[in-house]
Amino acid sequence: MASSAPSSSSCTFQAESSFGPAVASCRRAFDFTLYFEEVVFVLVPSCVFILLAATRLLFILRRARRFTTATAATTTSTDTSSSHSCGNAAQNQHTPIGHGLAHHHILQQCTAGLLVTLHVAGLILLCTTVPSRQRTDLSVPASVVAALAFGVVPVLAHFEHKRRRPSSGPRSSSLLVGLFLCVAVLLRAPLVRTHAALYGSGSALVAVEIASLVLQLVLIAVGEVSSWAADATSNFSPEESAGFLGRSFGSWLWGTFVTGYRTTLSLDSLVPIDSSLESRIVATSFDHILPVSPSGKPGKNGQYRLLLALFRSLGLYALAPVIPRLCLAGFTLAQPFLASATINYIGNGPAPDRDGYGLIGATFLIYTGIAVSTGWYWSLSYKNVTKIRGGLVDGVSQKMLRLSQQHGTESKVLTMMINDVYRITSTLAYAHELWVAPIETAIGTWMLCRHVGPPGLVVLGIIGVCLGTSTYVGKHMAIQQGVWLAAVERRIGATKKMLASIKAIKMMGAGPSVAEALERLRRLEFAASRKFRALIVGTLLSSYSTATLAPVLVFGTYIGATTAAADFSASTLFTSLIWISLLASPLIQLLQIIPSFGAALGSLERIDAFFEKQEFTDERDEATAVDSSCSEKGEKKKEHVSLSIHNSSFSYTDDSEDPILKDVNLVINRGQHVVVTGPAGCGKSLLLQAILGEVAPQNSGSRVCVDGKVAFCSQTPWLENLSARQVVSRFSRDKDPSWTDRVVDACELREFLEAQDPDATIGSQGSMLSGGERQRLALARAIQSRPDILLLDDVLSPIDYVTKKRILRQLFGKSGILHETGTTVVQVTQDHAVAQLADIVLRLDETGALRPYQFPPSQADVEDENGDVDNGAENTRPRESSHTTEAQSGPPEPKSKPTEITDRKVYATYFESIGFLNLVLFIGGGIIFAFCLKFPNVWVGWWTADSSDPDEASHNIGYWFGIYAMLNVLPLIAVAGWVAQLMMLIVPLSGSKLHRKLVDTVSKATFSFISRVDTGSLLNRFNQDLMFVDSRLPLDLFNTAAALLTGIAQVILIGVSAVYVLASIPVLAAVLFLLQHFYLRTSKQLRHLDLQSKAELHTRLSESYQGLATIRAARWQRQVHAEFQAGLDRSQAPVYLLWMVQTWLKLVLNLVVAGLALVVMGAAVGLHQHGSSSGASASASGIGIAFLNLTTLGETMTNLLTAWTSLETTLGAIARIVSFSRDTPAERDVLVRPDSLDHGGGGGGDRAEPPESWPESGGIKLEGVWATYDDDDESDENTDDSGGRPATDVAADGEKHEATTITTTSSTMTTTHYALKDISLEVRPGERVAVCGRTGSGKSTLLLALLGLVAVRRGRISIDGRDVAGVPRARLRGAVHVIPQDPFISVASGNGETIREALDPAGKLGDEEVTDVLQDCGVLDKIVGAGGLAASVSDEALSLSAGERQLFVLARLICRAGGRCRHGGGGILLLDEATSSLDVNTDGKTAEVLRKWLPNMTVLSVLHRLEAALKYDRVVVLEGGRVAHVVTPSESTVSSDIFAFFGRSRSFLESRETGGVSWLE
């Protein structure tokens, strides 16, 4: 190639051999030197790629070897939880790579090979066709290194494809390869341009290089479409199979956006996420966040131990966001240079066109670089915090399974899982801002000083003051957050009690008092958070101080240091302001983050303290480790000993000086059936806890040994909200259907299961079932697991006698399955029928001593030995359950999804909660703040325009600066008042109203609905949703409003300063509208799924904690944890995808800003070049104002997006509250209109509110009652009594009549399952009636019907002649006294309620009378031990057993109703198996207590014991929802049917009447 002789050395080829970087203009205009391009564009990226590729290859090969070893070790094991995993668990399956990916890989390898060939050809042409004088010293080495780098590409791509982690998905193109190819294309293009200029565009070398560039683009495209080939054949994450560009611009999310836009997303329809986020992988990486040997005390490093452990668990991935963050910092800090160059270009007159084109190109590179680096930075940061979330939640669940059950632990776990983990993850997402902010500050200050000199250092002073303030606030914020979260825990604990006891609360009519107690706790919570919220106000005020005060201090110092007449050029002033704004804008965020870090450290400290808690020690393991035999050392072993306890004393607390069980010695051989009995509160359940290892012996030299697999059934059955069939086989690995059939038949569940819908759930803790059905399910589940040792804690007490006798014979009889399998059984019971079949009977007395015992013989024993109990009326018709449930595959959420709740309704609900005046003040405060914040920019524009010509200035600099300083102080005053109003007034006001809305919805919901909803789902609304309302929503609302109003002001300023930009505003508005329209549909659904999936975690944690003893007894922890991990995977997917779509939106908005910047720059350059002739030109001050706002507009829009998307999430919580409140069926206050009632017997009194004294006498009358749990149409047929009335009315004139009239009707109702069918019954005032029947016969339903808790479709129920259908339900339940089956004491733990106030809130009785009641009920000693009547009523303080709780509730009822009844008043008392947990002697005494304290009260009692039933005036037996028998025990002639029902004969009554021996006595 020929060239002209150079005129100087700078214009010869020697100029190309210098580093430059710019080449002399006489050679080429606006270009780099060849040497610079070879070093920077070829050598550096190629060498870096080769080093990184070698490191990656070593990592892949080492990982492949580790996986091969791990696979060999794990293929022999079976995942016991696979049947319970769902949703995104599918991504765990190792789907083989299909033909599409194989063909794609071949194409990629062929393209890469051809590319290497072209590079080798180019190297040959460079050496052969280009003279050495036209090459630099690095031309050939650079080409060799480049060829080597491209030779590594197919090698690395091949190993990424073949040696991938099996669960990680197909990666046909490595991210590293994609990054290198994209960088190589961008950098290689200028080099090809240089070669074309040097060697001619038609040379062979240039042609090969152009072909190489094209082939690189093809290879990039091949890599980008790898995800399309993968999606067709696999179920792997589209993110992992996406290429570099797909990851950079978020194209892998397009499938999610399209699906969300067109259809409704569900947890199962979400795309699989990155396999590195799978819980099993995260748990392995984060396993050391749990202390190896927890000491029960905080760790040595305190809050930093867990923080360091988290980052250590992330490993090098913790540093992944560093590179994109540095790139983002570089692009951001380049903006002032661009602005300064643009202002100089505009202000310095004509300039070459290439300078303008260079500015446009620089604008494109800078703002596009900001967009892409922002996307990468936040995607990598969110991936890390998603891992941290998974690790922390998984760690909390693991730790919970290792702890002993203690009061408050469950609420603490739920609070940590939601509140603390959220605070930690949302804060740690900004972790890298902590180290990059000082770097940006240092560079920005240095550059500021270059413009204004030493006065620029003043900005460091204000930054230091603000940082010190934020650090101080952060330290105290952690303390105040602890105080606040402690109050949250108390409220959550009380709410959990309320939800768990919702049936008892509704029956007792305690809803209003419970709601008031929860509201009181809510108020205490806001009082506890007041200082925390005040600190937030201080934080926000401090964060805005730098942005507003720094310009004033810098310019003031500059003016004072120079002369009073000093003036600024537009370039100096606006460049300085841009640097200050770039310093202040991230500092606003940083100064808000620092206190948040303090709060996050406080949360880490709370979780770490939880991790350090002393763990449950399984004494069985320790004993078995010492000696595999449970026999005494030195003792000749004749029989195999299953369990033994030697010289051991036990108590519920380790520090108790007086053990409950003392010097226990017990040896039980394999196959023995041992019964333990004793009075209430003597320690029977504690003995079982000791055998389980849940409590440790308190004396030295003790020994507890258990040999074999254990199963445990507690007195309160632990059941999960599954179908009944799933419960039975829940933890069974035995797939033998014949064994399952035997267990189902032995537990008398066959007919019950056949009557159930296969998909119907049983409700939280089996709330849709009767007590007997719950216990039988738990018993079947335990036996199904084939235990060696079975521990039963009074599980048969809620079961009717006949069913119980069958179960006893089929389980414990000589042909029973437990006898056949040689299962050792230890059973706590008060039931003599159970004791009959025991090999050993032991009794615990009040002193804690365990002694052999023999029940006295009774006539019942003789009958049971001589006759079969399976005769009589119980076989005359099939048994039916009164608790059949509708098909329910999960908890019944509101019928409409939250997405159906419009935004208008959500905002209206929130604005209604804060009040109209507060709303107006908030909007006004925001507008004032935005105006005050941005108006100084306009003032600066006027200032520079006026000062451009000092001779014509209208005002001196003091005028301009003084007003400028005042204007910059106004935003601080405005923001202080604005935020104070929000945090101190709006937050408690809205939080209280929304909490009350939830409480009212739950308390007023129909019983049939609320009993089917998962407790975890409900609790999630009181926990997570209200946490969003209290802590997230106010800050999100403030940040959204501030960013929105500020952004509007910036756009206005840009448009006013650069008028030509106004033409792009409509286009910008249209783009933003379409963007939000497309984005919001998906993001809203993901937010809902995020909240929904956390409800599942709530449920799993809550259910697991309630069943800890049962789970640990059978060692089901691993399976429970695996299932929790499956639920955590389902929860991680929407969380991660929501963060990713938010990152995508940030990327797109930054690209929009890039487009706006290009419009500004292009118009400015165009007007400068061509506008002089037409008179249209851009002013320097106008461009300065435009760029001053443009440099921060992108960050403003990003902040707006971040705050707005977070606000949408919190508003999603309000949408859930609105949806739940709207779609939850509420009880009607009055079932029918009073004027439509049939007043038979009631006269006209039904039309008015019952008098205060109602019911005065307590008479009850049921006439042809048909009742159902179906509440879809409560009022249906309530006003139509035809067909439901008895044939003849029972007179109400006081004459003696048969108390019960049994009628039949011809009407048949087959469309609805009726729990009560044509019940007619009359109970006279003061009469005591026992209601008996088989399990599920409708006994409890009868009481629920009386209380209006189930729908009475036909018939009539009246009390004292008044139809209860016309009585408000709250009034009805308040007038009837109830003791439910599951005793409920109080939710008010922690708010100061005393035992005295709980027993007699109205103060009707004196302390002596209250003490007498407690003494008669047998719980006075417990109350005295807890601190007397002035002690707290909390469960932790009382420590009552199940039986003692029933006695306490009885005492409370007597205290509240006894005054009236003892002075001649009547009333009604309903007992729903209220003494089922008491021994027979105590049960008998309760009847005497009731007669003593409530002599005139009408009693309707559901019970199972014949001995107790015979103490009542009459006995009613129900079967299949109908009245089967009614007898009066005192009659001389009684039908034998009633005794046949109880498995007794007539002789039993005769022995009772003649003083025969009875074990009751």
Curated annotation (Swiss-Prot):
It is found in: Membrane. The chain crosses the membrane at residues 34-54, 110-130, 139-159, 172-192, 202-222, 314-334, 358-378, 428-448, 452-472, 535-555, 577-597, 913-933, 969-989, 1037-1054, 1147-1167. Residues 853-899, 1229-1298 are annotated as: Disordered. InterPro entries: AAA+_ATPase, ABC1_TM_dom, ABC1_TM_sf, ABC_transporter-like_ATP-bd, ABC_transporter-like_CS, ABC_transporter_C-like, ABCC_6TM_D1, ABCC_6TM_D2. CDD domains: ABC_6TM_ABCC_D1 (cd18579), ABC_6TM_ABCC_D2 (cd18580). Glycans are attached at residues 384, 647, 721, 1189, 1496. Belongs to the ABC transporter superfamily. ABCC family. Conjugate transporter (TC 3.A.1.208) subfamily. This is ABC-type transporter phomO'. It comes from Diaporthe leptostromiformis (Lupinosis disease fungus). The gene is phomO'.
